[in-house]
Amino acid sequence: MNASCAALWSLGSSRMATRAQFESSNEVGVFAKLTNSYCLVALGGSEHFYSTLEAELAPHIPVVHATVGGTRVIGRVCVGNRRGLIVPSITTDQELQHLRNSLPDSVEIRRVEERLSALGNNVACNDYVALLHTDMDKETEEIVQDVLGVEAFRATIGKQTLVGSYCHFTNQGGLVHVMTPVEDMEELSQLLQVPLTAGTVNRGSDLVGAGLIANDWAAFCGMDTTATELAVVERIFKIATRNQQKLNLVDDLTLRSSLIDTLS
């Protein structure tokens, strides 16, 4: 970890995950994309949404207002990490130039031709590894590896091919949808080299990739996210307060059991 990342981690380690809402939607991962070097947010949200994110992020990384292909579902159509950002072919030249002008110079931006154009639904990544939809083009896989500087693997999350919708992981840990078999979760954890846990957001939604955004030192979930769900997010992404960091394995199993009971 470099000095700047260490400083950000130090700042973020005592914070809690924050609830937020884009207009009337709790799917914050649909309207925003958060990495360790930038945050993209859709146009047209409330001032409260922007101020909530900027209060946590703006002192450390740019919070950039943008559209992709004229849409606001920016979190679902692009994929990125601290090194790069990949956008679909529907991205206009003007939008591309705005992103290049707004993001740090160290971030490479690439526009790709891909049949599975909702890249955020079909790819999940951190700064080291990416999981891809099993049917993604080979050329796109190579671009993901090149631009983001990651190892790329085709995978499913508990039989779900939309890996970007059903999981979210950072360099600290990851959340997968609650019906993911334990053996699958263990295999993915080994592959990603980060701890994983199963959970939900927004009061039982298993679309965790759509319902939250997180990096190595901050996380934002929809307003409907319960205290139990929030506790899971804070622990697995290692952004909990010191008291919450004292949770042990028994606590984790209790939280998982509570989530499963809620869904049954």
Curated annotation (Swiss-Prot):
Gene3D superfamilies: L-arginine/glycine Amidinotransferase, Chain A. GO terms for molecular function: ribosomal large subunit binding; translation initiation factor activity. Keywords: Cytoplasm, Initiation factor, Nucleus, Protein biosynthesis, Ribosome biogenesis. It comes from the Eukaryota. SMART domains: eIF6. Its main location: cytoplasm. InterPro entries: eIF6. It is found in: Cytoplasm; Nucleus, Nucleolus. GO terms for biological process: cytosolic ribosome assembly; ribosomal large subunit biogenesis. GO terms for cellular component: cytoplasm; nucleolus. The keyword Cytoplasm applies. HAMAP family: eIF_6 (MF_00032). PANTHER family: TRANSLATION INITIATION FACTOR 6. Monomer. Associates with the 60S ribosomal subunit. Binds to the 60S ribosomal subunit and prevents its association with the 40S ribosomal subunit to form the 80S initiation complex in the cytoplasm. May also be involved in ribosome biogenesis. Belongs to the eIF-6 family. This is Eukaryotic translation initiation factor 6. It comes from Toxoplasma gondii (strain ATCC 50861 / VEG).
